[in-house]
Amino acid sequence: LPVAAHSLPGPARPTSGEQADPRIVPRRFVQLPDERTIAYAQTGSGPDLVAIHGTLMCLEDQWLGPVPALAEHFRVVAVDRPGHGFSLRPRGCGADIWDQATQIREAVQKLGLNRPIILGHSFGAAIALAYGMLYPDEIAGIVSLAPVCFPELRLEHLLFGPRALPLGGDLLTRILHASSDPALLPLLWNAMFLPQTMPQQFRQHFPFELAGRAAQITAEGEDAGWLWPALTRSALRYPSLRVPTRILCGGADIVVNSYLHGVVAARLIPGASLEMVPGAGHMFPHSHPEVVVRAALSLKH
C-alpha cells in the first residue's frame, strides 16, 4: 500500500467480506478530534486493563500473547497505537510517547474505563510509564514489559528514521518497501523472539502485512525520531511517578538491554517492583504469559 499523504498508518477500517484477512482481529473505533482514531479490540470481564503493543507490531501481538490469560481476570482493551494498525494520526504529529499516551487516554475516557491498569510492551511500555506520569490518579497501576526507558541510539533510528523525513522520506519508503523490506522485516520479527524462536501460533496468525506496510514503517520512523527527547523527559520524571508499577524484563533480551533500562528505571521509580525472567528474550510475554498475569493481578483493585 502507498504511504498515506495526510495520515498514518493507512486505511481507516479493516477489509470486510470474503477478502478479509482472517488473522486480523475485528476492531472497534474511537473517533478523536483532528481525524484521529484509536482502534481497539475487547475481551474478558473484570477490572479494566489496557494493553499497548510495541514497535513493528499491532494489537494482534498482545492478542496472541498475554491477552487470553489476562482475559480470565480482566476486561482487556487492546489498542493499536496511534499511527499503527488501524489507528490514525496526522502525518508528522503525535509520534511522541507522551502524545501517544494522551491519545490513548482520550480513548480510555470515551470508552468509560474505570481506573484501568495500563500494560505496555517495549515501546508501548514507555507509553504506559508516560501515561502514569501524566494521569496518576486515573489508573490503578502500570505493568511495564521489556520497557525502553532511556535515550540511546537504536536500530529503529537507522532503519526507519530517514523514512519519516519531510523531504524525500515518502520516496525512500516506497523504494525500500519494494526492495529491502521483504527480506529485512522478517529478520527483525524473528530476532525479536531470540533466544527463543517465534511461536508457530504467532507465525501463522500474526498479520505481518498489516504491521509491515509502508505507512506503518513511516510511523515507526516518526516514533524513532521523537524517542530521544521523549525518553529524556521520562528519565527526569521517573522519581516523581507515584503509581504502583511492575517492571518485567527478559534476562536474555537482545532488543532492549534489561540492565540499562528496566533495572535502572525500577531503582528510580518509587516503590516499583522488578522481575527478571531468566533466559527469556524480548518477547517473553508470549513464552511466559503467567508472569504477566501475576504482575497484573498484584495491581487488581
Predicted regions and their residues:
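Acidic catalytic loop of the alpha/beta-hydrolase fold
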Residues: 228, 252-256, 282-283
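Active-site loop/oxyanion-hole signature of alpha/beta-hydrolase fold enzymes
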Residues: 33, 78-123, 294
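Flexible "cap/lid" loop of the alpha/beta hydrolase fold
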Residues: 133, 142-175
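Short alpha-helix in the alpha/beta-hydrolase fold that links the catalytic acid
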Residues: 234-235, 243, 258-265
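Conserved alpha/beta-hydrolase catalytic His-Asp/Glu region
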Residues: 153-156, 177-239
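Short beta-strand/loop motif that positions the catalytic acidic residue
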Residues: 241, 247-249
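Catalytic active-site module of serine/aspartate enzymes centered on a nucleophile-bearing elbow/loop
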Residues: 270-301
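Conserved HGGG/HGGXW glycine-rich cap/lid loop of the alpha/beta-hydrolase fold
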Residues: 36, 41-86
